[in-house]
């Protein structure tokens, strides 16, 4: 494994802490897909890298702001639906990605789970 492993492990632990969050690998062993609930609703995709990247959904306004940052780009295949990909190469990027994962969970989770996550 690379030096990026601790960052990937920290992102994985963060994503799995939300209510009814689970990990799946529908795109192969190198893509850690985080889903919410019993269905197939994704809220984040982690690639261990290097570099570690995370793909997630944002609101239109947040997406516009995020895309101004040098470590964020439109996600391949799903970018037109509001998804972006961020490379985690330093601490500020890591902190921003954690907040964006939280936002993506909020956007994708059923209402009852959203309320329990923030109560």
Locations of the language-model features?
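Charge-dense, helix-prone N-terminal extensions
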Residues: 1-119
């Amino acid at each position: 494994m690379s030096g990026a492993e601790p960052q990937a492990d920290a992102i994985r632990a963060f994503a799995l802490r939300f209510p009814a969050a689970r990990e799946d690998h529908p795109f192969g062993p190198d893509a850690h897909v985080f889903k919410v609930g019993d269905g197939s609703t994704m809220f984040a995709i982690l690639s261990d890298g290097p570099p570690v990247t995370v793909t997630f959904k944002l609101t239109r306004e947040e997406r516009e702001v995020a895309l101004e940052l040098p470590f964020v780009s439109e996600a391949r295949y799903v970018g037109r639906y509001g998804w972006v990909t961020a490379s985690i190469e330093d601490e500020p990027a890591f902190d921003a990605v954690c907040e964006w994962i939280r936002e993506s969970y909020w956007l994708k989770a059923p209402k009852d789970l959203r309320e329990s996550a923030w109560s």
